[in-house]
């Protein structure tokens, strides 16, 4: 695992820039060799962040499909998985977790370099902003890693048992992840490159893909894209 106090070229999904206040956040990358499908890494990491927020700050957070963690409607954390294979053909994954821990949300604005990025300030938050007090990054990291390790080892054990991914560990993670999704049941838009698809987020399948019911009644499977919630 690698931790840093600052990133000069942090990245989110689809090449987006991850911006944070130096010395205030959790910026971590964990090298793993999962024996299970990578989408389960996204699920377990998202749940680890949600659980750690609840334990550390007594704040209820939710997951925005596929891998953002929200408090209310504002993003407080993001997950990024990058995968490859070693020379023996074994899966290698880097699990990146970024959490806005300390600092007031207003502090983020000076680190945004364009009008588009500056507009994102209205959709971000920090744990300190919501909790009202500075949060120990060390305590948060320890709790988060404990949750990641527990779920990761359970999935590794399940994968080597020869009974596939329908056993309790993966099923429990899927069910808990689905239960924390704030996206389901909402009318949303999904931006995919230059195109946009709108409809109601009806469910997710076992692979974590989003099932979107379009206004025509057609149900389409969404494997990637940026989900946008309409203004309330």
Regions found by a protein language model. Name each.
Residues 12-14, 105-106:
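Short glycine-/acidic-enriched loop or helix-start segments at secondary-structure transitions
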Residues 4, 61-65:
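General beta-strand structural signal in soluble alpha/beta enzymes
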Residues 68:
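Conserved active-site carboxylates
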Residues 36-37, 43-61, 71-232:
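Long, positively charged amphipathic alpha-helical accessory segments at protein N-termini or as interdomain linkers
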Residues 13-37, 41-45:
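DPxDG-like acidic metal-binding loop motif
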